[in-house]
């Protein structure tokens, strides 16, 4: 009998729409591969829904809270339902960008200069030399991210909104000019490196998910030694945070820095996008792994105590 796979998608984070698109793509591919699939638009009754469904595997395609921060992983552990991607601890660490920075730096993965600040601090005055980047400490898909440039006399006024939806803790980091690079890890296998050219000022939400929002250059147009270093650092980051299944690490590379400090890891994504414009499926395809083979591998890799 075919395995029953519950594809967890949607949820209530700011990345809900992207998750629904990822979930639809994955569910369709899993059905084509012969699995019995139930699409679950995750609500706060998810534990009750999954208890009733009794799936063999939960395929987690949620982005943001609660699917990327360890919450859904903890529920699945309690219900004893094997699941895809990373476990409770790795998910929580990667979602907390400030904590992830500490872990990555300790493992030898270079991170940008910066640190955690409150929204109130960030809204009052520049908290570091411009240009710098402000981003929610527990956000994703570049939602709520600002580049504070040299010609800006004051921090972004959006930070003073009473209905600010992205939490009270922000990560402030120096802005690294240059190339946007990304690399994925699949189990213990590191994939290739993509160079991203955005039509926007930076690789924001629209660039990531709107057709034509960015151009993906694969393989990236960088020197072989930099290419291999990105791959090595991606695998190191995956292991340092204790990731499982598939992860994607994002980097900036400034070729003008000749002292070796030009390659910086921005973050590790434990729930990378799986839409038609997403990077991980593209990297897998470049390695000869079809989308159907990728999602099948993720189902068969699912387990508990990840």
Curated annotation (Swiss-Prot):
Mg(2+) 2 binds at residues 267, 269. Keywords: ATP-binding, Cell shape, Cell wall biogenesis/degradation, Cytoplasm, Ligase, Magnesium, Manganese, Metal-binding, Nucleotide-binding, Peptidoglycan synthesis. Its EC number is 6.3.2.4. It comes from Xanthobacter autotrophicus (strain ATCC BAA-1158 / Py2). PROSITE patterns: ATP_GRASP, DALA_DALA_LIGASE_1, DALA_DALA_LIGASE_2. Mg(2+) 1 binds at residues 250, 267. The gene is ddl. GO terms for molecular function: ATP binding; D-alanine-D-alanine ligase activity; metal ion binding. This is D-alanine--D-alanine ligase. It catalyses: 2 D-alanine + ATP = D-alanyl-D-alanine + ADP + phosphate + H(+). The lineage of its organism: Bacteria, Pseudomonadati, Pseudomonadota, Alphaproteobacteria, Hyphomicrobiales. SUPFAM superfamilies: Glutathione synthetase ATP-binding domain-like (SSF56059), PreATP-grasp domain (SSF52440). It holds the Pfam family Dala_Dala_lig_C. PANTHER family: D-ALANINE--D-ALANINE LIGASE (PTHR23132), D-ALANINE--D-ALANINE LIGASE B (PTHR23132:SF23). Belongs to the D-alanine--D-alanine ligase family. The keyword ATP-binding applies.
